[in-house]
Every structure is written in structure tokens, then in C-alpha cells.
Design a protein with these regions (language model features):
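Active-site recognition of the HExxH zinc-binding catalytic motif
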Residues: 68-75, 171, 251, 256-281
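Active-site-proximal, well-structured secondary-structure segments within enzyme catalytic domains
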Residues: 1-18, 29, 61, 66, ...
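Short, charge-rich amphipathic alpha-helices with coiled-coil/heptad character
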Residues: 30-47
Length: 284
């Protein structure tokens, strides 16, 4: 993927790594060059923060001011209370209390992990302190030392299509629904695939789009969206939903399939769970 990025950028002699998670994460995990790890992580964490024409600080301040104004127009003190009003937590105070309850045990666990990672770092670089760009690299070393497990060795078992088919099979076993790939459907990008979802009797559950690969202009991360919501109209007709799962997994290259990390597998199943929520909705 890094070679293809370089070719696309007009540098066929090079390898191009970018501040995208799918690009720089393997570098942070496996690159022995500490300075390169630092450079990539800093490039990622300081995006939009260089006091130039692409700087976002003023935009963020303005965005937050507008969110506060919007919340107050609706009678709420802050944006968090406004957003949470129809959620289980109800308000920011409840969320803060929950976060406080997990803070101490989480901090203890993080310090315990950092201590183990520092030991490994000290073996390689005596006198150096653990830094953010060391964390993933030495986590991989610790995993190999403790469990003789290299995440890269797991990836061939998690080819993207196999993982997605596994998710479909699980949904079939749990809910009795089937997934049929549809060819020739209108899509906004050639990489997008479309599936018709039906019950055992052939009745329509909904339509699922999947858009799994990064590309220029696409937002990072993974999410589910409703393209068309499920609803029952005034005549009692149930309109079935159109749902999309979006990800940014490693794109297959010439002769090489898209192989997922364990974290990627969890992400795919997580977003597929949201898709099932949307597909199986029978709200009025």
C-alpha cells in the first residue's frame, strides 16, 4: 500500500507513509527507527495545528462557540447536555461520574503497562524514558515476549471478505437473515459494494452498502449511517432502510488481498452491529 501511495504521488522509487491510521500504525508497531516513529506520530497528532493556511484552531473555537449558542437556544447549559438529553445518560453530569469511576482503575492499568514497556525500552536504550511513539512498538515486543504472538502472523486468517462473510453468517444464525450481493447498483465509488438483506421467507429486511477502503477526501475512522431510515407511513406501509457501513481498512494491492488486524476485525463487527440495528428496525 505504501508503494502504491508513492507511485500515485509521483515517487515510484519511494515508499509513502501518511498521517492516516492505516498507513502509519504499522510503522509505529514495527519500525526500529525511533525518530521516524516520532516524526509520523507527531505529524498525525499535530494536523491542522501549524499556524498556516490549514490551521484549524480558530475554526474549532468558532465551532464550539456555535455549539454552546445552539444548546442555550434550546434551553441547555452546554452542548453535552443538549446532545445527551435523549440518550441513556441524560446529561453531562452522569457521563462525568461514569468517567471518574473508571479513571482510577484505568490509570493503574496504564501505569502497570508503562512499567513493563519501560523495561523493554531500557534494554534497547539505557537511560531513555518511554515516549508516546514508543508505546505501540514496545507493546508488540511485549506481546511477542509474553505470548510468542506476532499480530502480523494473524492477519492471513482475517482476509476482509472472509471476515465480512463471517459477520453475515453470524447474523444469519442469530436472526435468520440472508445477504445477497447485488451487481449493477448505483454507487458513489467503484469500491462500494451493495447487498440485499432478506428474511428466510424472502421478505425484504433492507439494503446494506459497504465502503471499506481509504481514499483521497474520505474521512478517517469507521461508522454506520442510515441512507434511508426505516419508517411506517400514514397508510401503515413499512418502508425498509438503506444502511451503509464505512471503514478505512488496508486496501488490497496487486496480488495481495486486504488483511485485517485483530483491531480491524473488532471494528468491522462493531460497525456491522450498528448496521444490524438499523436494518432490523421496526419502529413506527
Amino acid at each position: 500500500a505504501a508503494k502504491e501511495e508513492a507511485v500515485a504521488a509521483g515517487r515510484p522509487e519511494a515508499w509513502l507513509f501518511t498521517p492516516k491510521r492505516t498507513s502509519f500504525t504499522p510503522v509505529l508497531q514495527y519500525c526500529e527507527n525511533r525518530e521516524l516513529r516520532k516524526e509520523l506520530l507527531m505529524a498525525y497528532t499535530t494536523r491542522g495545528n501549524h499556524d498556516n493556511e490549514n490551521d484549524n484552531k480558530d475554526i474549532i473555537v468558532k465551532t464550539m462557540q456555535l455549539r454552546v449558542e445552539k444548546a442555550q437556544l434550546f434551553g441547555y447549559t452546554n452542548p453535552a447536555d443538549y446532545i445527551l438529553a435523549d440518550c441513556m445518560a441524560k446529561d453531562a453530569k452522569t457521563v462525568d461520574a461514569f468517567l471518574e469511576s473508571v479513571w482510577e482503575p484505568s490509570l493503574k492499568a496504564a501505569k502497570r503497562e508503562a512499567k513493563e514497556l519501560q523495561k523493554l525500552l531500557s534494554q534497547d536504550l539505557p537511560g531513555e524514558k518511554l515516549q508516546p511513539w514508543d508505546w505501540w512498538f514496545y507493546t508488540e515486543k511485549l506481546r511477542e515476549a509474553k505470548y510468542d504472538l506476532n499480530e502480523e502472523e494473524l492477519k492471513p486468517y482475517f482476509e476482509l471478505n472472509n471476515v465480512r462473510n463471517g459477520a453475515f453468517q453470524l447474523a444469519h444464525e442469530l436472526f435468520g437473515i440472508n445477504f445477497e450481493k447485488l451487481e449493477g447498483m448505483p454507487v458513489y465509488n467503484p469500491e462500494v459494494e451493495v447487498f440485499k438483506v432478506t428474511y428466510a421467507d424472502g421478505s425484504l429486511v433492507g439494503i446494506l452498502y459497504t465502503d471499506y477502503f481509504p481514499r483521497a477526501g474520505k474521512r478517517p475512522g469507521a461508522w454506520m449511517n442510515n441512507i434511508c431510515n426505516q419508517y411506517v407511513d400514514a397508510n401503515g406501509v413499512d418502508h425498509r432502510p438503506v444502511i451503509i457501513n464505512v471503514g478505512n481498512f488496508n486496501k488490497p494491492t496487486q496480488g495481495n488481498p486486504s488483511l485485517l488486524s485483530m483491531d480491524d476485525v473488532e471494528t468491522l463487527f462493531h460497525e456491522f452491529g450498528h448496521a444490524l440495528h438499523g436494518l432490523l428496525s421496526k419502529a413506527t
